[in-house]
Amino acid sequence: MAGFVYSPYNAYQGYGGNFGQNPHRPQAFPKNKQAAWKSNKSSEPPDYLDHFQRAQLKAILSQVNPNLTPRLRKVNTKEMGVQVNPRVDTGVQCSLGPRTLRRPPPPPSSPVKPTDCARFSRPVAVYSPVVDRRLFSLPQGGRLPKKSLPAPDSQSQPLKDRGPSPEEKEPETKEALEKSPVPGAEEPNEEEPNKPAFQFLEQKYGYFHCKDCKTRWESAYVWCISGSNKVYFKQLCRKCQKGFNPYRVEVIQCQVCAKTRCSCPQKKRHIDLKRPHRQELCGRCKNKKLSCDNTYSYKYIV
């Protein structure tokens, strides 16, 4: 009778249940079995009773006592763990062993059109108001078509009676400034309209001579237009504040024969042709930033 009441095998292995054990046998403490998903070596299913053995046990217990039924157990559940690690491929480890989740293949899409590659639904940059570059793409010809200006309306006619607007006055003032002569400025040649609007300045040796207060000294470095002796920066005399542009630049040549290289026995003033700025009255340029060796220097004026 005990063989029918108590099942000869443990119906609940792995959970440590006391049901189904022979009371005459000494009770042994069940060992905590490691979960199946932790052991990577075994890929066999757990040792649970299948549905056939459970139905057979239920039939035997119903003959002894209809109230005796096997204890409910986890039949359709399995222990599993999900490995989430950004450095390792995402995998699901269950009783059947580790299995890597694979992404489903993307659905077949239509071939990409050339217009789809140039879509910009957002602004091109933070500082750029352009939302779509296709709006500003040039046609195949390479130039944008010129739009014809709209014809003047009849409403613009009464505006002329009020007088010239400030925008119309600006070109008139510009024309007046261009016509008025500027001291020291060279008039551009009409033959060379594409001449750049800049000049090179050359530093030359000159002298300061005011005809009003009769002030004169030598060894004056003057900024002149390159290739000429015209003084670029013109100002009043520092002493009397009357004489305009007292700076002069003398030609570097002999004052007797008017040659750059000469062999005259006597000269009006001693001029070293190799270093023409070094004259008898010169001497203040020594050991200074603008020394005799750095006579000529160029400056770019825009």
Curated annotation (Swiss-Prot):
One of its GO terms (molecular function) is zinc ion binding. Oocyte-specific. GO terms for biological process: negative regulation of translation; oocyte maturation; translation. Residues 15-46, 88-117, 138-195 are annotated as: Disordered. It is found in: Cytoplasm, Cytoplasmic ribonucleoprotein granule. Residues 159-178 have a biased composition (Basic and acidic residues). It comes from the Eukaryota. GO terms for cellular component: cytoplasm; cytoplasmic ribonucleoprotein granule. Its main location: cytoplasm. Pfam families: Zn_ribbon_3CxxC. The keyword Translocase does not apply. mRNA-binding protein required for maternal mRNA storage, translation and degradation during oocyte maturation. Probably promotes formation of some phase-separated membraneless compartment that stores maternal mRNAs in oocytes: acts by undergoing liquid-liquid phase separation upon binding to maternal mRNAs. Binds to the 3'-UTR of maternal mRNAs, inhibiting their translation. Belongs to the ZAR1 family. Disordered regions undergo liquid-liquid phase separation (LLPS) for the formation of membraneless compartments that store maternal mRNAs in oocytes. This is Zygote arrest protein 2.S. It comes from Xenopus laevis.
